[in-house]
A protein has these predicted regions:
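Hydrophobic beta-strand segment of the Class I
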Residues: 22-23
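SAM cofactor-binding core of SAM-dependent methyltransferases
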Residues: 1-6
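Class I S-adenosyl-L-methionine
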Residues: 7-19, 29-172
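Conserved NAD(P)H cofactor-binding loop of Rossmann-fold oxidoreductase domains
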Residues: 26
Length: 172
């Protein structure tokens, strides 16, 4: 059975539009930089290649999972959606997929902003770049007077220089 937003709402005992924040990280390993080899300005891993998964009934493209997340989000209608994915989504041919994601946010009624953040700038002893999407339902942005620039301003400034594992564990 396909999971619906209504299934989740029923399980939580709430109605569409009552969820404040929906946070998700749908896998998009086809766009991951892990193991990618750069040749002639392009990446040989991931971009344009289809990875598949099977739930025992059908086989689907793994990159379609982001749109499944957005399908469920449309049904739940949270005030804010936060989503995280690999930074490779913002590079080369994958950028078309990124645009498809942002267009889908807009089609389902959300104002969206995104930024690549590196965890090492936020006190994590690891360099891990991720694109973060913050989407606010249009009626909420109108009610509180948010604009695209206000949403973009939600992203935090980097607050630390990169730290090592030794730095992180030195006082334990």
């Amino acid at each position: 059975k396909e999971l619906t937003g209504q299934d989740l709402l029923d399980a939580a005992g709430i109605k569409a539009g009552e969820v404040d924040i929906l946070d998700g990280s749908p896998p998009c390993s086809a766009f991951s930089m892990a193991g990618a080899v750069v040749q002639g300005g392009g990446h040989t891993k991931g971009f344009g290649k289809t990875k598949k998964y099977s739930d025992g009934k059908k086989v689907e493209n793994i990159e379609d999972l982001f749109f499944e997340f957005l399908r469920v989000a449309k049904e739940i209608r949270p005030k804010v959606i936060v989503a995280e994915n690999v930074a490779g989504l913002m590079m080369g041919e994958a950028k078309q997929y990124y645009y498809k994601i942002t267009n889908t946010f807009e089609k389902i009624g959300y104002d969206v902003s995104s930024m690549v953040l590196d965890s090492s700038h936020y006190g994590v002893p690891q360099t891990r770049k991720r694109v973060i999407f913050i989407a606010v339902r249009e009626d909420v942005t109108e009610a509180v007077g948010l604009t695209f620039m206000n949403i973009a301003g939600i992203f935090p400034d980097k607050f630390s220089e990169a730290i090592t594992c030794g730095d992180a564990f030195s006082d334990l």
